[in-house]
């Protein structure tokens, strides 16, 4: 039958690209699954991780109830108190927006500067902590942004929380599968507002690809 033909074809697809990464910090380990629906961001992150690009960089911007941000190459060995966040790799990644991929707690997302196509930084990322929302708040959000959430997405924002105001504005390209407690621990560190919300004690990372 034709059904069996399609099954046979499926089997011969090329080996799946790696899509799991691990971020190790003094606060513990965060495991992240990169989404296949955002292949440009997935492949770029894997490439940088394999090159060791992120090793020794910091979570340089941390805001409790919002997110933890990292991936600035200038944060390696940066003197204490130096504001960070301008370092880059010299290219951007085209936005890969998908209404199914939301800024729930634990979402891995691409940072970016203001630009008309909302292209992502080639290296800087953030992991969402966020807060929980009520139905009324989500209704207002939908009116403001024009986004319509599914009942399942609403449940996520009501129960686990996130940052829905960033949806379809910044590319979401992965999610934490283990170590949400580590995200919470990092989000709670003491920060220096004058240095762009940089943690007072450096939060260094190493990132490796889990093959």
Feature names for model-found ranges:
Residues 3-211:
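Cyclophilin-like peptidyl-prolyl cis-trans isomerases
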